[in-house]
Regions:
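Conserved NAD(P)H cofactor-binding loop of Rossmann-fold oxidoreductase domains
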Residues: 94-99
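Substrate-binding pocket helix/loop in short-chain dehydrogenase/reductase
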Residues: 101-111
């Protein structure tokens, strides 16, 4: 029965009320943009269910602090993870570029948005690929703007659409 503890445990409620309890003990989770917002909620939920969670974010905090648009930062982040674990079970690409539109976004800012939203997720997965556990999962977070843009959010839309 102990081997079942490593498997997700589902508790089903009545009618439409389905409560799902998942256990992630001994799982390693990587979250980009996990210092606040959706990324923080994702990281907190995995931690609450027993996972070892590695967060990278530009915002200062109790996590790896760095700008994922920089290749050497991603390499250092992965080196830190791999020095402690030889496998990764989940990669959550959640970091978001700035949200600027065509009227105010410079060429350099647009390139930065693409680096955060496209290049960084690609390179992070490439670096971690040799360490992905059997059954590992990669989740790329996006928004509805990848299907229906709004004015003055073009940089965000372009970066989010590419990794969907």
């Amino acid at each position: 029965m102990d081997e079942l503890k490593d498997i997700a445990i589902f508790t089903i409620g009545f009618k439409e009320n389905v409560i799902m309890e998942l256990e992630f003990r001994n799982k390693v989770v990587v979250v980009t943009g996990g210092a606040n917002g959706i990324g923080k909620c994702i990281a907190d939920e995995f931690r609450a269910r027993g996972a070892e969670v590695y967060v990278i974010d530009k915002q200062e905090g109790d996590h790896f602090v760095g700008d994922i648009s920089r290749k050497e930062i991603l390499e250092s982040f992965v080196a830190e993870i791999i020095s402690r674990h030889l496998k990764v079970d989940y990669i959550i690409n959640n970091a978001l570029p700035m949200m600027k539109g065509i009227d105010e976004c410079t060429y350099e800012e647009f390139q930065y948005a693409l680096s955060v939203g496209v290049t960084a997720p690609f390179y992070l997965v490439k670096l971690l690929k040799p360490y992905l556990a059997d059954g590992a999962c990669i989740i790329n977070i996006s928004s509805s703007r990848d299907r229906m843009s709004q004015p003055q959010t073009e940089s965000y839309t372009a970066a989010g659409r590419t990794c969907r």
